[in-house]
Curated annotation (Swiss-Prot):
Catalytic activity entry: XMP + L-glutamine + ATP + H2O = GMP + L-glutamate + AMP + diphosphate + 2 H(+)
GO cellular component, one term: cytosol
UniProt-listed Enzyme Commission number(s): 6.3.5.2
Biological source species: Pediococcus pentosaceus (strain ATCC 25745 / CCUG 21536 / LMG 10740 / 183-1w)
Positions bound to ATP: S230, G231, G232, V233, D234, S235, S236
KW Transferase (keyword) present: no
Subunit structure of this chain's protein: Homodimer.
Alphabetical list of SUPFAM superfamilies matching this protein: Adenine nucleotide alpha hydrolases-like, Class I glutamine amidotransferase-like, GMP synthetase C-terminal dimerisation domain
Protein name (database record): GMP synthase [glutamine-hydrolyzing]
The protein's annotated pathway: Purine metabolism; GMP biosynthesis; GMP from XMP (L-Gln route): step 1/1
GO MF annotation: an example: GMP synthase activity
Amino acid sequence: MANADLSNFDKIIVLDFGSQYNQLITRRIREFGIYSELLSHKITAEEIKKINPKGIIFSGGPNSVYDKDAFRIDPEIYKLGIPILGICYGMQLMTYNLGGRVEPADNREYGHADIDVTDDQAVMFKELPAKQTVWMSHGDLVREVPEGFKTVATSANCPIASMADDARKFYGVQFHAEVRNTQYGNEILRHFAFDVCEAKANWSMNDFIDMQVQQIRETVGDRKVLLGLSGGVDSSVVGVLLNKAIGDQLVCIFVDHGLLRKGEAKQVMDSLEGKFGLNIIKVDAQDRFLSKLAGVSEPEQKRKIIGNEFIQVFNDEAQKLKGIDFLAQGTLYTDVIESGTDTAQTIKSHHNVGGLPEDMHFELIEPLRTLFKDEARDLGEKLGMPEDLVWRQPFPGPGLGIRVIGEITEDKLQIVRDSDLILREEIKKAGLDRDIWQYFTVLPGIRSVGVMGDGRTYDYTVGIRAVNSIDGMTADFARIPWDVLQKISVRIVNEVDHVNRIVYDITSKPPATVEWE
C-alpha cells in the first residue's frame, strides 16, 4: 500500500477517547502547518516512541474515569518526556493517573461558560485576556490537582478549569479548546503546539505532493494501477496525482450510469482526459441501469440495484484488462477514523469500489488516506485542477437515482438535472457556493395544480435542499437570502418543463437526513 512517509514532518498525535470533537483537534493542529493524527488510546509507549511526536493530546470522551469500562492508557506514556495536553476527559484521566482527585460535578456544565485565568504566567494563556468564554461539556471535574500541578484557570462551576505542570510540560483544560465556541481556543492550542512542544510548521501540501509522487513511483515501479473514477472530488484528485507520478501506467474506468448531473460526464472527460491526459475507459451504461431500475420505487432497492450494477459493470471492464497489480481508491482520513478507531460508534460504508471478485488480487493504493476533505481539495488545487472540479458539490454514490423519489424515468431525471444546474448557477452568482456545505434539488413525485399564462397546469413540484454542516453527522438548513431563493424559483418554473411549484426544505438533521432517500 502506498501511504505517506511522514518521518520528515514534526507531529502531534491525538489519542482517541471517544469525543465527538476528536477530528477537530487533529484538523486544528494541521491548520497550524503541523502534521497530526488521531490514534487509538490503546497505543503503547513503545509505539509512540517509534512515531517520535513533538506532543501528545488526550481527547475528551463520554466516560467517567471511575467507570469500569473507562478508556485507559499505557502509564509508561507519562515517562516518555513528551509534552501532553489533556482536554476534558483527557485532563480528568491525567489527574486520575497521576494522583489527583476527580469527582462528579455538583453542577454539570454543557455549553458556554466564562473562565478566569488566575495565573498570569500560564504558558497556555500567554497574552490572552484573563476573562474568556469557553465551551464546556462535562459531568465530572477535577477537585484536586496531582502533585507538581497548579491551577491556572477557574469557572463558576469548575474550580479547576485548567491546570499546568511546567516542569514535565503536562497541561489540562476542562473545556474544549478545539471548537469555535471557545473564544481563544485556537490560540491555546497554538501555545501548546509551538511554545510547549516547539513543533515546526513543516507540513505543507507541496511537500506532501513531492513525497507521495516519489513513494508511488517506488511502490508501483513499472506495474499498472486501476482506478474507478466516479467524477467526484476524491477519485479525481487521486487520478491526477497518480497520473503525475506514473503517467500511462494508470488505467481509469469511468462508468456513466445515466444518473449524473447535467454535463458532468463531459466535464470529467474534458478535464481529466483532455487537460491532464488520464487514460480513461468510459463505459456508457445508461440504458443498462435504467432498464434495471424500471418500475422500482423503494429507495433501498434502488440503491442496491445501482450499487450492484455499478460493481458488475466495473468488474466486466476490469476483467478485460491485463497486467493490473494495484487498485487505487479515494479513501480519506475521515473514512479511516470512522471505521478504524476503538471508540467509533458507527462503521461507515465507503463509496469506493467494492465487491470485487476474489480472483482479482490487487494491492491497494490510497494516497489520500491521511488527508481530510478540505486538504484533498487543497491538493487538487495545488495539482492545477480546475476550481469547478475541485469544489464540486458532494454527490451520493447512487447519483440522481435517490433524488428522484419513487420510480426513475428519463423525463424525471431531466427535471432534476435542469433544476439542479439552475440552483448551482444562482448559488454561485450569489457568492454562496463556498459558504453552503451542500445544496441540490429533488423531485418528490408530487404534482399540483397551477396557472401558467391563461391555462391550468398539473405539474411537478421541485424541492430545494441546502444545509450547513461540519462533519455530515448533524446538519442545519441553510438560510439562503429570500431574493436568491426567489430568483432560483422563477428560473426553474420558467426554464424547466413540467414544473409549476418550488418548495424549500427547512428541516435539520436530525430528524431528517440530508438526502431525501
